[in-house]
Regions:
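AMP-forming adenylation/ATP pyrophosphatase catalytic core
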Residues: 126-135, 142-368
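ATP-dependent adenylation/nucleotidyltransferase module used to activate substrates
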Residues: 1-158, 169, 178
Length: 368
C-alpha cells in the first residue's frame, strides 16, 4: 500500500517540485495550502512570490491539477495569530528582535499541519525547504544541510521535534535551485519561473513598527538616544522601531557612523555607539531544542550561526545549570541580537539551537 504524504504547497516552485518528486517516487500525494492570514488583509499578500495570499492558492491549485493530485485549502488562521503574530508583537514589545518564520515552521507548518494530516490518514508531511532529514547512528533525527549552501534553510528549522522530523520528507534538499526550476519546466508546472518569496509574509512593506501599532492599537512612547556614558544624543520614535546593529533611520549626525548597540526598555533608551562596539564573542542561549543529541557536554565544539544570513563561525558550547547554553566564539561576531536564533552545527547537521538572550561584548560591560 502506498504511503500517504501531505505536501504543504505555497504556490511556489520549490513546494510544487516537492509534490512532483514525491509522486514520482510512488507516494500517494495530497496537496494542501495553509490559509493563515485574515481575509480582510489577504490582498496585501497577493504579490508575486507571496506565500499567504490568493495568488498562492491559485498557483498551487493549478500545479495540483497538472500533477493530478487532490488539493485542499485548510484554515490555520487562529494558530498563525497565536503562535506567530502574537509572538512577533510581544517580542518587539520587550525590545527583542524575533524571527517569525521559525515560530511559523515549528508551530504552524509542522505542529498544526502534521496534526491535521495524521487525522486524515497521512503517514508524512512534506515541504519544499532546502534541507534534508537524517537519522543518526544514535537513533535521533536531525536536519542536515542542503546540497546548496546558498539556499540552505536549516537555520529556520532548528526547533522541530523528533516526532515532527520522523514524519517529515524534504525532497528538495537534494537539489540545487537551477535543477529545481529545470525539473519544474520538464514536468510542465506553471510556476517554473515564479520568483522566490523574500519578505516576512505579513509585513511585505518591511514597516514592522506600523504593523505592530495597527495590531495592538497602542502608541509607543518616544525616548532618548544615549551614548555608552549616558549622554543624550537625540530622541527616538519608540523602541519598536529599532534593532541591534541598525544604522539607518537614526537621524543623528556624527563624524563617524553610529549604530544601535542596545535597547533598554526599563528606561526607554536606545544606546548608540560605533561599529566596533557591536562585536561580541560570548552569548547566552535560552529555550534550547536539542536535535542531534539529547544534551551536550561542557566544551562541545560546534559551528554557530546567529542570524539567517550568517555564514557560521567556530565556537565552544557549555550547558548551564539554568538550562541555558553559554556560547563562546573563537572570533568576535557582529551584532548578536536578543530574540534571534542561534543554531549550532556538527558534521553538516543541526546539533541544537535556541534564542539569544544576552551577549557580553569585548569590554565585558554587558553581563547577563
Amino acid at each position: 500500500m502506498k504511503k500517504k504524504v501531505v505536501v504543504g504547497m505555497s504556490g511556489g516552485v520549490d513546494s510544487s517540485v516537492a509534490a512532483y518528486l514525491l509522486k514520482e517516487q510512488g507516494y500517494d500525494v495530497i496537496g494542501v495550502t495553509m490559509q493563515i492570514w485574515r481575509d480582510e488583509d489577504v490582498f496585501k499578500q497577493s504579490q508575486e512570490g507571496g506565500c499567504c495570499g490568493l495568488s498562492a492558492v491559485e498557483d498551487a491549485r493549478r500545479v495540483a491539477a497538472v500533477l493530478d493530485i487532490p488539493y485542499y485549502v485548510m484554515n490555520f488562521k487562529a494558530d498563525f495569530k497565536k503562535y506567530v503574530i502574537d509572538y512577533f508583537v510581544s517580542e518587539y514589545e520587550r525590545a527583542y528582535t524575533p524571527n517569525p518564520c521559525i515560530a511559523c515552521n515549528r508551530y504552524v507548518k509542522w505542529e498544526s499541519l502534521l496534526h491535521r494530516s495524521l487525522e486524515i490518514g497521512a503517514d508524512y508531511i512534506a515541504t519544499g525547504h532546502y534541507a534534508r532529514i537524517a537519522q543518526l547512528p544514535n537513533g535521533r533525527y536531525t536536519i542536515a544541510n542542503s546540497v546548496t549552501a546558498e539556499k540552505d534553510q536549516t537555520y529556520a528549522l532548528y526547533n522541530l521535534t523528533q516526532e515532527q522530523l520522523r514524519r517529515t520528507l524534504m525532497p528538495v534538499g537534494e537539489y540545487e535551485k537551477p535543477q529545481i526550476r529545470r525539473i519544474a519546466e520538464e514536468a510542465g508546472l506553471p510556476v517554473a519561473h515564479k520568483s522566490d518569496s523574500q519578505d516576512i509574509c505579513f509585513v511585505p512593506d518591511h514597516d514592522y513598527a506600523s504593523f505592530i501599532e495597527n495590531e495592538t492599537g497602542k502608541t509607543y512612547e518616544p525616548g532618548n538616544f544615549v551614548d555608552e556614558s549616558g549622554n543624550i544624543l537625540g530622541r527616538h520614535k519608540g523602541l519598536i522601531h529599532y534593532t541591534i546593529g541598525q544604522r539607518k533611520g537614526l537621524g543623528i549626525t556624527a563624524a563617524t557612523p553610529l549604530f544601535v548597540k542596545e535597547l533598554r526598555p526599563a528606561t526607554n533608551e536606545v544606546v548608540i555607539s560605533t561599529n566596533e562596539s557591536l562585536f561580541s564573542d560570548t552569548c547566552y542561549i535560552s529555550d534550547i531544542n536539542y536535535m542531534a543529541q539529547e544534551h551536550i557536554t561542557p566544551g562541545t565544539r560546534s559551528i554557530g550561526k546567529v542570524r539567517y544570513s550568517h555564514r557560521g563561525a567556530d565556537c565552544t558550547l557549555t550547558p548551564m545549570e539554568n538550562g541555558m547554553i553559554k556560547c563562546v566564539f573563537d572570533e568576535p561576531q557582529r551584532a548578536m541580537t536578543p530574540g534571534q536564533a542561534a543554531v549550532f552545527y556538527q558534521d553538516g547537521h543541526v546539533l541544537c539551537g535556541g534564542t539569544i538572550e544576552k551577549m557580553v561584548n569585548l569590554m565585558g560591560d554587558l553581563p547577563i
